[in-house]
């Protein structure tokens, strides 16, 4: 079994996350994808609560799973009493899937700081690291010294920050996220001024 792990604040989850999940399933041959909702240490005024972010991530998984069970939302990081690091998350996932092949899915922006992450060597021992690069022109700028890191081109102009800003300005984002998440955001009154 091949298990992919994608961590993030998912504040809110959007169609870029949906596309990345489907990409992982179809092109990386991931059998199970864990979307781990992480703590947001830089909480801003217009951020959703932990429980709201987890609920929206569960809605995203429901959308992804319409074509077969594949994706699970995980709140393990939110339940920790101390800061959780990627290496801790991977140890937890390894305990759930002791014989599975693990792949950590990260965006290029996050990967650029990989050397400063806690225990990067152990991360590479626990999982293959797959970096989603923003495009071929950016992939040529990446450091090549890191072995065992796989780069794949995946360009998505969406960001949760952009969506929160648009919602705060009263703009519609209904075409940029699954309809169930759009309804949830409106029902809960999230990200408004």
UniProtKB/Swiss-Prot annotation:
Any one Gene Ontology MF annotation carried by this entry is: ATP binding
Keyword annotations for this protein? ATP-binding, NAD, Nucleotide-binding, Nucleotidyltransferase, Pyridine nucleotide biosynthesis, Transferase
Query: What InterPro entries does the record point to?
Result: Cyt_trans-like, NadD/NMNAT, Rossmann-like_a/b/a_fold
Please report the name of this protein according to its UniProt entry. Probable nicotinate-nucleotide adenylyltransferase
**Domain of life per record:** Bacteria
As recorded in UniProt, coiled-coil segments are none
- Purpose of the protein: Catalyzes the reversible adenylation of nicotinate mononucleotide (NaMN) to nicotinic acid adenine dinucleotide (NaAD).
């Amino acid at each position: 079994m091949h298990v992919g792990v994608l961590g993030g604040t998912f504040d809110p989850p959007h169609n870029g996350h949906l596309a990345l999940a489907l990409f992982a399933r179809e092109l990386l041959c991931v059998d199970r994808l864990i979307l781990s909702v992480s703590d947001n240490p830089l909480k801003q005024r217009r951020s959703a609560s932990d429980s709201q972010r987890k609920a929206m991530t569960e809605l995203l998984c429901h959308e992804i799973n319409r074509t077969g069970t594949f994706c699970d939302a995980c709140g393990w990081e939110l339940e920790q009493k101390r800061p959780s690091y990627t290496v801790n998350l991977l140890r937890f996932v390894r305990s759930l899937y002791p014989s599975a092949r693990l792949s950590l899915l990260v965006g290029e922006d996050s990967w650029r700081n990989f050397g400063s992450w806690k225990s990067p060597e152990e991360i590479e021992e626990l999982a293959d690291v797959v970096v989603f690069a923003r495009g071929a022109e950016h992939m040529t700028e990446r450091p090549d010294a890191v072995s065992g890191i796989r780069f794949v081109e995946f360009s998505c102009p969406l960001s949760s920050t952009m969506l929160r800003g648009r919602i705060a300005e009263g703009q519609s984002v209904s075409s940029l996220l699954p309809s169930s998440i759009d309804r949830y955001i409106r029902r809960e009154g999230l990200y408004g001024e």
